[in-house]
Amino acid sequence: MRTLALSLFILGCHSAAPAGSEAEPDAGPPTVDGGTTCAPGLAGAPCVLDRYDRAQGCDPTAVATLRTELDARAGLGPLWAGGRALFRTAAPIGIAGDWNNWDTTALASSAFCGTDLVIAVGAVPTGLHPYKLVDGAAWSLDPLDPAFAYDDFAGNADGRNSVLDTPDSGLGHLVELDPACSTVLGNCRDVTAYLPPAYDAPENGTRTYPVLFMHDGQNVWDDHDCCFGHTGWEVNVTLDSEIANAKVAPIIVIAAASTTARNNEYGLDEPTMLQFISFQVDQLQPAALAHVRHDGGKLAIAGSSLGGLVAMELAMRHPEIYSAAASLSGAFWPRMDQHTALRDEVPGFGKQALAIYLDHGGDPSDNSDGAADTIEVRDQLVTLGWQRSDSPSCAPGPNALCYDWAPGATHDELAWKARAWRFLEFLFPAQLH
């Protein structure tokens, strides 16, 4: 199981040597207990690289100490500090990335001090660096690194590269979490997450973050090959820009992919939707949150089309879990014939302490992109006590309803990509986090 939450950075204290005694050698970067154990997780990278330097003489105790520190970080990917990166691999193999111009011979792992500990240490500058492991003609992802980036290079059969994102890159990165499986629904789905810039920096080892969950997780990142050629929402790219410009607070985004049962799970069939809602609340979310540094507050939930519908259903049914929902081009028509559509349910849900974002493209006159349906739900919410304002002049809060109409905008990922900044700035303004 990949664990991304174990990043505590506690400065160790080193007392001065007593008068008349011989001074002890420099203990290196700060440690948890004053010299024997590095700070946990990737926050301890400077200390682990110091342990590597100390083991260069192949002293068995120093090598064992290094192994212990690396074992404690198994599955977290390469460690970086001070312009150097340490990679651990299962067997000797080449490591090619953008920092060495994808040279297959520039860096390779090997047995350290004649042991079965296989590592490589090389110079890597600040930045977000894609890389692959290379064995002869075979290029592969690093199975010990959950971080990845999409790659639309035709020669990359994976469609992805592994990633080393240095804490000072100014960029966030994507990570793969454990798949989420449901015995009731009879399926599994991939779960990925966006971790904000400097998430793994030593100084942020104890920092926690607000969390946004998103539906249709395979469509929300910068995968240029997805979504009928429309590219994804590129929420990760948008967040990097919005955070850098101090418009959006650093947040974690967790996105679960939809399955072949998407339509029914997201609201077409009410019994299946209710099963999915229980799965999302009771299984998927707690499992994913265990692997990131959540601030413990209520969650936000977002989606588009049917994903926007089920986001609203989740938030309205579980205000004890969610503080906000965003529905982009929400498909609010399912179950109209049964009089159990969202518009039929909203009066019964009543006013909840939720910030809500609703938008659409198209034209209300012909209900293209669900425009008329969205306006009807918007007006119902206002009647119940939500206070409407129009993007981008929306202030967050438990009574806030932020609305946007993009006239003529189509029902696809390109349109949602163009509007994603609106709900992010509304729900996670930098000045309030």
Tell where the protein language model's regions lie, with residue ranges.
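Aromatic-rich carbohydrate-binding modules that target alpha-glucans
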Residues: G75-T126, V134-P167, C181-S182
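Short beta-strand element of the alpha/beta-hydrolase
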Residues: E203-G217
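N-terminal cap/lid segment of alpha/beta-hydrolase-fold proteins
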Residues: A157-E203
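Primarily recognizes the serine-hydrolase "nucleophile elbow" in alpha/beta-hydrolase
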Residues: G296-K351
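Ser/Thr-rich, Pro/Gly/Ala-heavy low-complexity intrinsically disordered linkers and tails
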Residues: M1, A5-P40
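Gly/Ser-rich "nucleophile elbow"/oxyanion-hole loop immediately N-terminal to the catalytic nucleophile
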Residues: D200-P202, E265-S305
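Cap/lid segment of the alpha/beta-hydrolase catalytic domain
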Residues: V220-T231, A244-S278
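C-terminal catalytic histidine-bearing segment of alpha/beta-hydrolase fold enzymes
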Residues: D359, D363-S365, D369-R378, L384-H433
